Structure formats: C-alpha cells, structure tokens
Amino acid sequence: MIRYLLSKLLLIEAILLLVPVSVATYYRESSQVFIALFSTIGILVLLGGLGVLQKPKNQRIYAKEGVLIVALCWILWSFFGGLPFVFSGQIPSVIDAFFEISSGFTTTGATILNDVSVLSRSLLFWRSFTHLIGGMGVLVFALAIMDNAKNSHLEVMKAEVPGPVFGKVVSKLKNTAQILYLLYLGLFSLFVVIYYLAGMPLFDSFVIAMGTAGTGGFTVYNDGIAHYGSSLITYLVSFGVLVFGVNFNLYYFLMLRRVKAFFGDEELRAYVIIVLVSTSLITLNTLHLYQGVSKSFEMALFQVSNIITTTGFGYGDITNWPLFSQFILLFLMGIGGSAGSTAGGLKVIRGLILTKIAKNQILSILSPHRVLTLHVNKTVIDKDTQHKILKYFAIYMMIILSLIFIVSLDSNDFLVVTSAVFSCFNNIGPILGTTSSFAIFSPISKILLSFAMIAGRLEIYPILLLFMKRTWSKR
C-alpha cells in the first residue's frame, strides 16, 4: 500500500508541474526550461505509472504506514520538485535544488540564491506554488482530490497536520480535507485580488499571495516586499500572514456562525496578545531608527507577523536593530503560529499548555495535596496529553541544540547559526545576522537543514521514525 500510494502521489506532482509549463508557455521561455520541466514530468510519470500497475489487495493504512507515507512523500516531492532547476541549469547543484524546494514545500522560504532574478518566470512561479501546495499539507491536498480517500487515511493526516491534536471538522475525512482546502484556496484567491488592487503586478500578486497563504516567504525580488515601496502593501502582507497563522477550524466555526467558539479560543487570544506585545516592545525599542512612530510600528508589525507565522517575507536590513528587538524575533521563531494553521514552529497551543503545566507544578509545591487540573478552552487536558507535549518539547530542544552544534562548524557567528537552525526547523526562512542566504553553508549542512525543514513541518516524529529499524520491520 505504501508503494501504491507514493506512486499515485508522484503522478499528482507530475500533474502539478503542468502549472509552471503553462507559465513558461505564456512568457515564451527558452526550450531549455521546457526540456527541464517535461523531463521531470516524464520521470515522475514513469516511476508513478510503474508503481500503480498492481493495486494492493489490502488497502488498510495503519499508523506505521501513515507515518512512512508522509515522510517519504515529502522527501520524494522535494527531490523531484527540485529537478527542473537542475536540468535547466538555473540551480546546477542537486543539493541546492533539494534545499530550495524542501524550503518551498515546507513553506520555510529559506533560499540558497543570492539573486532570484537568475530564475525564469516559470520556475519562480513553481518555487512559490510549492508554498501553496505545502501550506495545508501535501497529503491533505492529495486526499482532497483522490476519489478513493477513506477514513483509514486518517492516519496519514494525523502524521502530517501540524499541531498536538488533529480532529475532523465533519464526519467524513474526504469532506474535512475538501472543506479545509476550499477555505484555504478561497482566502488565497481573496489576497490575490487584494494585492493586485493595492498596486502589485498580476504575476507578483499571485506569487506573494501563495507565499502569504502558505506562510512561506518566497518573493519575486531580492529586496522582498520593500521593492514595492508601499506602506499599504506592507500592512496588507502583515495582516495576510496573520490571517493564515490562525487555526483553520476556527474559520469553519465562523462560517457556521459559531462566533463565541471563534473569539473564545484561548490559543487565538494568546496569539493576538503575543503579536500586540511583541510589536509594541519592538516599536518602542526601534523608535530612534525610523522617522516617527508610524514607520517604526509598520516595520515592527511586519517583522513580528512574518516571524510568528513563520512566513519570513524579507523587508530591509534588521541587523542594525537593537539586540533586544532581535532576541524578541528569535523568541517568536520558537513559538510559531496556531495549531491547524499553515504556520510552522512549536505552536502557540503547546506554549500555552507548557506555561500552564509550569504554573501547576509551582502550585503543587505550595499545596502538595491539592488536585490540579489543566484546562484549555474549557476542556481538560489529561496527563497523557501533557506528558506527550513535554516529551515533544524535550525532543524539539535536543534536535535544536544538536543542529546548532553541527552547523556551527560552518560559521563562527552565533546569531547566524542559531537563527539558521531555528529558521529551518521552525519553517521560518530568514537568518538574523550578516547574511540572508543559506549559500554560505556546506553541502552537509544544507542536507541537514533540508531534513530539519521537513522534520519541523511534519512535527519531528515521521522523519525520526525513518531511521528506526522497527519502522521497517514487517511485524
């Protein structure tokens, strides 16, 4: 069943590559670009076609199979998705291309390119299109369009959807995937129109809207959003990424007119408070760098919204910001957006629960015999869930520290190395410090950071389980 589903997913990626083909046709690009795209499509069709020839008798997907399908799918899609860049010569290195498209599908937005103008329009579009597909999840997208998606495929969605809890918004799995994707694509389309009306060229409005929707961060120009020189566009992008950093289940509740469920959500309230407090602190701390409070607020809101939602759109140089403001951004890198959103990171809900666990631990010292319960949205969080979140946080920190230790061999700049690891593992994109490109890192570090991006997007476990012998046993 693993082989069969992975083969179908490769065929889906082949179909998706027809999108940049149409862009290349519109812009009348060179034959080299067409050869690169059709060569990749041919490889995917050949491998996918061979894999679906024999349909498996047992189509049941268990937890282990679900984890393997998700992990292998993201690795394969990233590898094959990078081949057009290699075949066209626009990113000659296979490792660099794998890094770039891993960054795309995981909606990280980190890049090895110092100059994005080297890319043709079609591959520039494909790079950002991977944000749109990866935003709600490659497998969620696949299940939304597959005609035979079954509730047994819930194990696949559990392994991919970000956040500590996965729930169906309606009874049927396929309907859940379709509802989530319709909401997602509806909001994406809205922001394409908004950006276009705000003054962006149509091509740019699609690219930036895809980055906004997927909370990815790839742009059309080297200077990012600053290229447009518009405060209106800056504010719209800030608002847009914050919208996509909210749990999509809440938008579904809003559609059902369950207004109390939306505004009463503890994670949403914490998310808004963190954004407001962080923006206020950075605004005050950077007043001396800008002409007036309004510009300082604009820049602070843009950076805070882009970091907490793990979007990472670029806007100017923040290396001259006070260290206090830079450390606030580094802190926000660890938090991330809401569970069930397109944002990466640890997630606000986990931070909220960890804070409440710490509070209860302190209270238990003061009152040893008192029975303490932990509530989120008036729901009791049982001890098992609390322990799972604590274990996840411990593994999260161990991986972060291990990656910093290894990647530090490439650079002596603590802020660059630390923010690069946080940026990749939390799917954020930019590096704090003297560089904005990951081209400075060695091939080994790029491979590690590529897997860090995929591991971070899949909540660690699917990638870790790939390296366990028991995962591959038939028992």
Which residues are covered by each model-predicted region?
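Membrane-proximal intracellular helices of multi-pass ion channels
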Residues: M1-R475
